[in-house]
Each structure stands twice: as C-alpha cells, then as structure tokens.
Amino acid sequence: METLSIEIRLYMRRRAWSRRHFAHGTRAVEGTGYIKPVCPTRKSVSIVLRRTRSLARRIV
C-alpha cells in the first residue's frame, strides 16, 4: 500500500494538483469522495465520488 500511496502522490503532483486534495491513500478527496484500490497488483486505483457514485478517474 505504501508504494500505491507514493504512486498516487506522484500522479497528483504530475497533474499539478495540491497534495492536500487527499490525505493518505484511501482517505477523503476534497470531502466529495474517496480513493480505493482496484487491483493492488497493478497498483491501479479509482477515485469514487460519493455523490454520483461514478468513477471519476482511474490510474493504471
């Protein structure tokens, strides 16, 4: 999971997003949703919005 968090952080930095947009790997994102791991082996995660319950962004 540590590698996953690092990868997410690097991804967010690449997207020029503030790192406070989410706390640790699976905590809240701007209070609208959460990041959950999809496939730990492939280190891909999904940002699921609580309001729409739709997939916002997938990192593979």
Swiss-Prot record:
Lineage of origin: Viruses, Viruses incertae sedis, Naldaviricetes, Lefavirales, Baculoviridae
The protein's name in its UniProt record: Uncharacterized 7.1 kDa protein in ME53-IE0 intergenic region
Source organism: Autographa californica nuclear polyhedrosis virus (AcMNPV)
